């Protein structure tokens, strides 16, 4: 009975801290929406709404790798296979870096085409393109942050994971205000604040390594297709969830643009 009570208490602790952290994580775009609408008006808000689906895709990719890899890590840790846990983390990070560079290349070379595909007209094209390009260039930070958050949480440190997510969100709010209003950086300031948030979050997560609490680390090994394909299905539902919200946003934007235009 005592063991059951302990397991339930631990479960509730992980759940509560994760929910709090995810609420904080959801504030990334919410903060942008508020400050962009106040500082840049209807055109800025339209540009942001058009670009959000791409952010959802990046975030979904990070969650797929993070949740999939961390779940596989927990399974192997429970089986006392500590050598394989390092292989899981290493392959997850390698795959995340590869995916991030694909997003970066698309942002650098195809941001204009993607902006047109999302339905931006002449009035908001420039702002939408700027937001898309910068958010995609920050893809490594978003994806690696998602991976580290999940692994640190499953490594017995859900409190630090939650604190990192909340710190990242709070920094986004502060930087949004600073860049948009104080420094008058416009839409670039909004997306720069959002891109810096996961960097700050990872700095907080680094305490897990600096204090020597980590039970996983990178190791010299090649990418294993077998390992990667055992990780991806575990996190795939998270990608689908983010993609679904992005697709709904694209459909919603197209309907609104057809009926009312940008404003």
Regions found by a protein language model. Give the residues of each.
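N-terminal transmembrane alpha-helices
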Residues: 3-40, 53-68, 72, 97-104, ...
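Transmembrane helical elements of multi-pass membrane transporters/channels
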Residues: 13-32, 134, 145, 168, ...
């Amino acid at each position: 009975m005592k063991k059951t009570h302990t397991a339930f208490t631990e479960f509730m602790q992980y759940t509560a801290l994760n929910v709090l952290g995810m609420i904080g994580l959801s504030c990334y775009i919410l903060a942008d929406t508020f400050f962009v609408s106040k500082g840049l008006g209807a055109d800025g808000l339209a540009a942001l709404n058009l670009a959000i689906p791409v952010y959802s895709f990046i975030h979904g990719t990070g969650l797929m790798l993070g949740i999939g890899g961390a779940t596989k890590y927990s399974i192997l840790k429970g089986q006392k296979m500590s050598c394989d846990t390092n292989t899981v983390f290493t392959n997850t990070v390698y795959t995340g870096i590869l995916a991030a560079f694909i997003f970066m290349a698309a942002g650098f070379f195809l941001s204009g085409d993607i902006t047109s595909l999302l339905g931006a007209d002449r009035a908001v094209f420039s702002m939408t393109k700027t937001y898309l390009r910068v958010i995609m260039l920050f893809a490594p930070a978003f994806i690696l942050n998602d991976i580290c958050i999940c692994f640190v949480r499953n490594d017995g440190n859900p409190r630090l994971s939650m604190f990192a997510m909340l710190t990242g969100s709070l920094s986004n709010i502060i930087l949004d205000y600073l860049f948009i209003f104080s420094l008058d950086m416009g839409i670039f300031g909004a997306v720069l604040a959002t891109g810096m948030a996961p960097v700050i979050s990872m700095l907080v997560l680094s305490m897990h390594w600096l204090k020597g609490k980590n039970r996983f680390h990178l190791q010299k090994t090649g990418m294993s297709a077998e390992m990667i394909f055992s990780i991806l299905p575990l996190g795939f539902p998270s990608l689908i969830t983010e993609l679904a919200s992005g697709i709904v946003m694209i459909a919603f934007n197209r309907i609104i643009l057809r009926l009312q235009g940008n404003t």
